[in-house]
Amino acid sequence: LHITKKLPEFTSPKFIVSVDKQFRHAVECNHTATHLLNLSLRSTLGNHIQQKGSRVSDKNLRFDFSHFEKIEKNTLDKIEDNINDLIEKEIGLEVQTDVPTKKALKMGAIGIFGEKYGDKVRTVKFGESYELCGGTHVNNSKELWRFKIINETAIASGIRRIEAITNYSLKEYYNHKLKEFDSINHLLNNPVDVVETIKNLKDQSNKLKK
């Protein structure tokens, strides 16, 4: 059900309402990913993690949360791996509507700190992820395909931000990286070990600079 605050000026003609299915599905994937990210952050870094904001689009997602220090690469990899494990487990969506807010919180549902909720709320559950949420989601975690963290940074004292992609944008990202790799491989005359070749070239360059 969609509710609009403003009707067209002329309501007598017929209107065709359509949904961009891929756009909507991409948004659903990224929204569900914020829930799985929240769960993974709490399980990896600790229960001090609190959501401070988020933005979801068809292209990507960003998630702001309380944390006191920069997250190291190996920890980010662990968070990412945890989410991809949840995706591979094919966890189904469970939604409950008109749940008394106090009851939902008592049952362990997580809300946004400082957010004011009504007497009744909608809850969204993916396995151990259980949140108060009114947004649109995928029916199963497998629809995300994969999850990739693109950036992690500080946006204020004690607040970090993670930017990530899933599904359609991630496929485009991988295709772009594969083309880049092919170009590098071609420039280096198709070596057996590309990484080792680049390291050797870097060492030679450093020696020449001396």
Set out the residue ranges of the language-model regions.
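A glycine- and charged-residue-rich anion-binding loop/surface
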Residues: 1-210
